[in-house]
UniProtKB/Swiss-Prot annotation:
Heme b binds at residue 282. Its cofactor is heme b. Belongs to the peroxidase family. Peroxidase/catalase subfamily. InterPro entries: Catalase_peroxidase, Haem_peroxidase, Haem_peroxidase_sf, Peroxidases_heam-ligand_BS. Keywords: Heme, Hydrogen peroxide, Iron, Metal-binding, Oxidoreductase, Peroxidase, Signal. One of its GO terms (molecular function) is catalase activity. Homodimer or homotetramer. This is Catalase-peroxidase. Formation of the three residue Trp-Tyr-Met cross-link is important for the catalase, but not the peroxidase activity of the enzyme. It catalyses: H2O2 + AH2 = A + 2 H2O; 2 H2O2 = O2 + 2 H2O. The gene is katG. Residues 1-39 form the signal peptide. It comes from the Bacteria. It holds the Pfam family peroxidase.
Length: 753
């Protein structure tokens, strides 16, 4: 979902009902936008004056101009030059090299770096694929200043010497995950594997993190019986997952379990993976709440003074670190050996009866009843001190919720099963947003095909050549389906891709499988007709081969679209060849997790003039969101909409936005007729999002259109692009740019190219 423009400043709340929340909120209060920043000498954005104006910025983020590595830099190739064993050795040495400016708990930074890696990747949400570790976004606002990320600025500074040593060959995004892995290995845990390949961003992502205008505030993201707004996957603004003290700090493990189940499911984790992650993660390290944050902490990094050089939460109480550290406001360790992989978390969870207590910061946590185990846990810095183990309200949820308890008890009784479950869940957590295995780089990646990776069979046959391609194009165009249907099918398959988490796309031909074949936007009956035809072409060709040569349905889908576009261009006297590279494969239903793929179903697709009921964003905002997930620029989005309109591929088969007298001909008629001043536009009275184009002289209807169509004449930036393509000298450019943008979408999932 697109980020929303707040009409008021994002001020931090100074009071909430929860003491922990209040304390942390005050500690980051300087994140409140200063009104003086909008005053003298500062330019005001257009959205300041016109808040409802369409925001095209998502299509311009992470521009090549902001990347100091340059557009030709290939990170995967650079990563391959690393001696990963040497990198891991350097990280391992760092883990026990405690620094005076930020001393390591128990003399070992391992748990600290596990938290860093978890919080880097743990922002991922399945609904729209946003968040996650890709890009190293934890370095930037707002994530670097989220209340849940207190002190992680120090973790990244501790890693700087290693990042500095390996430079561009090791991204921050990869380094944070790799360090978490090495940390756990150094503490005796067996990691399932690691894959590199996460490129760094150099600016913050534009992500909708929630409607709130204050950190950790309120239930604005909830409706009804605690229904969390889509696409969000955290209970409050500024948290990775859930409030450790329970919903709104209510200290109730049962309601906390409901929050945990909802939120973890939204990041694609089932109950078993959830229990494994919580129990495994809390085996390591401790929480920090030595003092009240509102009395001790300076602002977060985004609001800190310039001399702090990007660090935040400066602590003016006691030593300012070590035994005086303040992070969550909760205080203590879950186990006796916080820097070793043990079963002590589950031992303690089930071995003690737990009662509420208050941390020194005033947060509610739990300790064993009747002072049992009061001296079990060594202090992280003061050798003469010992403490009782602690649990969060969310920890006790694993004991009190019947389903979680059953899993936790099984893990407790079967340590090897627990270790394997945590290992696999950790690998999934840290790699979920990378997409298919084809994107993995390095020799430490497991060879398993997990369903969550959307596996696609490898090509084990000879690919079609140029002569075959021409033969198949003829077969496709001479068949029982129309060129428009071929284009529509190719777009439906390829446009399921999400650049946010590299899922979807035409490769795998999953458009013939559940759930995609049944999506409303794909017009299932028509789609089935086209797929039957394409599968017959595939069978006839493959049966006619004497050798090992074959063509996949996925390749035929793309080739059909290419042939149809070439045909449409030829009707306008343009001889074009749409680039086509075979090599796609076809997945099976057994390789396709229906529930997981269901989240890819478009709620809107402006390229097909489709808009479902229940969207919170307008059709034009959803168009930009769709273009963003397809990694399109403003001109690419514009030329694709215009070209697909004249190709007549609307999802419902209507002529809405088909601004041409020659449907099926690839030309710039859409822009020419949209900008034609002999037409005036008025809103239809009886239909939603329908506009009528009326001839100014005859007063007769000439066209119909949606808001998605009209935005290219209404929005000043889009109109500027439309004017280029509508000009008399732009006919060839329009066709060329359309073909280039089309080819880009068709190959978004070709990670092998």
């Amino acid at each position: 979902m697109l980020p929303r423009v707040n009409k008021r400043s994002n001020c931090i709340a100074k009071k909430t009902s929860n003491r922990l929340i209040s304390a942390v909120s005050l500690a980051i209060a300087s994140l409140c936008i200063s009104q003086s920043a909008l005053a003298d000498g500062m330019p005001k954005t257009n959205t300041f004056w016109w808040p409802e104006q369409l925001n095209l910025q998502p299509l311009r983020q992470n521009d090549a101009k902001s990347n100091p590595l340059g557009g030709d830099f290939n990170y995967a190739d650079a990563f391959k030059t690393l001696n990963l064993a040497n990198v891991k050795s350097d990280i391992k040495a760092l883990l026990t090299s405690s620094q005076d400016w930020w001393p390591a708990d128990y003399g070992h930074y391992g748990p600290f770096f596990v938290r860093m890696a978890w919080h880097s990747t743990g922002t991922y949400r399945m609904s729209d694929g946003r968040g996650g570790g890709a890009g190293g976004q934890q370095r930037f606002e707002p994530l670097n200043s989220w209340p849940d990320n207190v002190s992680l600025d120090k973790a990244r500074r501790l890693l700087w010497p290693i990042k500095q040593k390996y430079g561009r060959s090791l991204s921050w995004a990869d380094l944070m995950v790799l360090t978490g892995n090495v940390a756990m290995e150094s503490m005796g845990f067996t990691i399932y594997g690691f894959a590199g390949g996460r490129e760094d961003d150099f600016e913050p992502d534009l992500v909708y993190w929630g409607p709130e205008k204050k950190w950790l505030g309120g239930n604005e993201r909830y409706s009804g019986e605690r229904k969390l707004e889509e696409p969000l996957a955290a209970v409050q603004m500024g948290l990775i997952y859930v409030n450790p003290e329970g919903p709104n700090g209510n200290h109730d493990p049962i309601s906390a379990a409901a929050d945990i189940r909802d939120v973890f499911a939204r990041m694609a984790m089932n109950d078993e993976e959830t229990v494994a992650l919580i129990a495994g993660g809390h085996t390591f390290g401790k929480a920090h709440g030595a003092h009240k944050p509102d009395e001790c902490l300076d602002p977060a990094p985004a609001g800190a003074t310039i001399e702090e050089q990007g660090l935040g939460w400066k602590n003016k109480c006691g030593k300012g670190n070590a035994e005086d550290t303040i992070t969550s406001g909760l205080e203590g360790a879950w186990s006796v050996s916080p820097t070793q992989w043990t079963m002590q978390y589950l031992d303690n969870l089930f071995g003690f009866e737990w009662v509420e207590t208050q941390s020194p910061a005033g947060a509610t946590q739990w300790i064993p009843k009747d002072n049992a185990g009061a001296n079990l846990v060594p202090d992280a810095h003061v050798k003469s001190k010992r403490h009782a183990p602690i649990m969060f309200t969310t920890d006790l949820a694993l004991k009190e919720d019947p389903q979680y308890r059953k899993i936790a008890e099984r893990f407790h009784a079967n340590p090897k099963e627990f270790e394997l479950a945590f290992s696999k869940a950790w690998f999934k957590l840290t790699h979920r947003d990378m997409g298919p295995r084809a994107r993995y780089v390095g020799d430490e990646s497991p060879t398993d095909d997990f369903l969550w990776q959307d596996p696609i069979p490898s090509v084990d046959y000879s690919l079609i050549d140029k002569r075959d391609i021409q033969h198949l194009k003829t077969k496709l165009l001479d068949g029982d389906v129309t060129p428009a249907q071929l284009v529509k099918t190719a777009w439906a398959a390829a446009a399921s891709f999400r650049a946010t988490d590299m899922r979807g796309g035409v490769n795998g031909a999953r458009i013939q499988l559940a759930p995609q074949k049944n999506w409303e936007v794909n017009n299932p009956d028509e789609l089935n007709t086209v797929l039957m035809f394409l599968n017959k072409v595939k069978k006839d060709f493959n049966d006619g081969q004497s050798g090992n040569k074959q063509v996949s349905l996925a390749d035929l889908i793309v080739l059909g679209g290419a042939a149809a576009i070439e045909h449409a261009a030829s009707k306008n006297d343009f001889d074009v060849e749409v680039p086509f590279i075979p090599g796609r494969s076809d997945a099976t239903q057994a390789q396709t997790e229906v529930e997981s793929f269901a989240v890819l179903e478009p709620k809107a697709d402006g390229f097909r003039n489709y808009y479902a009921q229940g969207n919170t964003l307008s059709p034009v905002e959803m168009l930009v969101d769709k273009a963003n997930t397809l990694d399109l620029s403003v001109p690419e989005m514009s030329v694709l909409v215009a070209g697909l309109r004249v190709m007549n591929i609307n999802a419902d088969g209507s002529d809405r936005g088909v601004l041409t007298d020659n449907p099926g001909t690839l030309n710039n008629d859409f822009f020419v007729n949209l900008l034609d001043m002999s037409t005036r536009w008025e809103k239809a009275k009886d239909q939603q999002d329908l506009y009528l184009g009326i001839d100014r002289k005859s007063n007769k209807q000439r066209w119909s259109a949606s808001s998605v169509d009209l935005i290219f004449g209404s929005n000043s930036e889009l109109r500027a692009v439309a004017e280029v393509y509508a000009s008399d000298d732009a006919h060839q450019q329009f066709v060329d740019d359309f073909v280039n943008a089309w080819t880009k979408v068709m190959t978004l999932d070709r990670f092998d190219l």
